[in-house]
Amino acid sequence: MDKKHCTLESINLSGCIILDKDVSGVEFDGADFTYARFERVNFTGCSFENCVMENTRFTDCRMTDMQVEGCRMFGAEFVGGELTGTEFRDCGMQSSGFLHTDMEKVAMVHCERHGMLFYSHGQREQILEHSSMEEI
């Protein structure tokens, strides 16, 4: 799946396990990632628009300078890895978790965040200080 700088529309990766890939620069539009698992995947510069990422798990992934807009992300988990410079806009992120994830300069704009979990020593202070998150 090393398809850099392309657009993937309405692709169904529901339940897939993707390991050790570089998909930097890919635009995902209307993709379904429900219950998918990504480990050590490089998503640098990717965009996700109107995707379903419910109960999707991202482990030790590099997710820098991404745009995520209009996505359903109920129960998504981000474990380890990096989310630096990423913007989430108009996403449903209820019950999502960010565990031991570097989240410097992350923006969550007009996102539903009820029940979100942030877990890492000192991470809550980092998020409040360096991210624009409405009504934490």
Regions found by a protein language model. Name each.
Residues 1-136:
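Tandem repeat scaffolds
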